[in-house]
């Protein structure tokens, strides 16, 4: 994971299902990106930091957080089954989060945004 204070991700394999939780990650550094691609390869579920929109991301460079477009690219490249965007900006309301989900689904239909109470079954 690429974050100024460090971060870690989790890859859990159970009964043939693969769950990847990638917290606090800013795309753009080739070495961590390559490691993350290997880490997320063929995951059934990928939960990915998408705090920013692609438009916001350039001015937030160095903060250690991702955006939905990077998440979609990773999911496509890694043949992920389901993408769940999380680590939403705390200033966003539910409508703004829904708008992000809709935008991401135009590129990767199996995308959703994590919400309080979300239950994931593998």
Question: Which role fits each region the language model picked out?
Answer:
Residues 20, 120-122:
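Extended recognition/assembly regions associated with phosphoester-bond processing machinery
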Residues 8-12:
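Short beta-strand scaffold segments in enzyme catalytic cores
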Residues 13-21:
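Metallo-beta-lactamase
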Residues 18, 26-116:
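Cap/insert and terminal regions of metallo-dependent hydrolase folds
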């Amino acid at each position: 994971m690429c974050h100024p204070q460090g971060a870690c991700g989790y890859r859990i394999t159970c009964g043939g299902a693969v769950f990847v939780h990638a917290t606090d990650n800013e795309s753009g550094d080739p070495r961590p990106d390559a490691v993350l691609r290997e880490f997320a390869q063929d995951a059934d579920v990928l939960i990915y930091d998408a705090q920013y929109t692609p438009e916001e991301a350039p001015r937030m460079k160095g903060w250690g957080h991702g955006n939905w477009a990077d998440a979609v690219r990773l999911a496509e490249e890694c043949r992920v089954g389901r993408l769940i965007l999380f680590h939403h900006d705390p200033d966003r309301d539910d409508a703004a989060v829904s708008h992000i989900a809709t935008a991401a689904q135009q590129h990767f239909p199996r995308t959703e945004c994590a919400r309080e109470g979300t239950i994931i079954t593998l």
